[in-house]
Design a protein with these regions (language model features):
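Glycine-rich, proline-tolerant flexible connector loops at the mouths of alpha/beta enzymes
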Residues: 1, 10-22
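Aromatic/hydrophobic pocket-lining residues that form the small-molecule binding cavity
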Residues: 1, 23, 27, 120
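Helix-coil boundary/capping segments in enzymes
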Residues: 1-4, 89
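Short, small-residue-enriched loops and turns at beta-alpha junctions
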Residues: 14-19, 45-51, 174-175
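Catalytic alpha/beta core domains of metabolic enzymes, predominantly
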Residues: 31-37, 44-149
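Conserved short secondary-structure transition element at the edge of the structured enzyme core
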Residues: 101-102, 138-174
Length: 179
């Protein structure tokens, strides 16, 4: 690309109803435009209205093995069943990290790891080393607190206690009321 970006996390187009073929065509156009790209698919039906199937992901990886390199699974329908060589599967929540690792996932991609990264890293490292899991429950508890609210508003509220900059949000987002 002219801007030298080559690695992307890309969600399918939102709003309109479409099927696997339209989604495959969408990613095909991107790859044709930027053949050197590496794409992590973003599976988040709640946000875009489309949920990847195992079959669709398999077709994309077969067609573009050098470009479609992983999936962030925030719909949680892939991380237990999708197994492909040289392909990373990453659930979108800390609460799925340990189970995901046990099933062969590569890790997680999650907004709240901005807060939980040290705990998530310990769970990951302890899993790889075969150590007892001493912080996984705490990690999941923190994630569960954020899930009670709008996640992004919760993150801004958390960070605004240290830096007023994080109070700057645009509607419909806002910081959480402390009461």
């Amino acid at each position: 690309s002219s801007l030298k970006f080559e690695n992307f996390l890309i969600m399918p187009p939102a709003y309109y109803k479409y099927g696997d073929e339209e989604v495959i065509n969408f990613y095909s156009k991107i790859i044709e435009s930027i053949p050197e790209c590496k794409i992590v698919l973003y599976n988040f039906e709640k946000l875009c209205g489309y949920r990847f199937s195992v079959e669709c992901v398999q077709k994309l990886v077969e067609r573009f093995p050098g470009q479609i390199v992983g999936v962030k699974d925030s719909s949680y329908n892939l991380f237990e069943n999708l197994k492909l060589d040289n392909f990373s599967v990453m659930p979108g929540s800390e609460s799925k990290l340990l189970k995901g690792l046990e099933l062969g996932c590569s890790g997680i991609i999650t907004a709240t790891c901005n807060v939980t990264s040290q705990l998530a890293r310990k769970v990951y490292d302890d899993f790889l080393a075969g150590n007892d899991q001493t912080v996984n429950q705490k990690l999941c508890d923190i994630r569960n607190i954020f899930e009670k609210y709008n996640l992004i508003s919760g993150l801004h509220t958390f960070y605004s206690t240290k830096d007023q900059f994080y109070k700057n949000v645009l509607p419909p987002l806002n910081t959480l009321n402390r009461s």
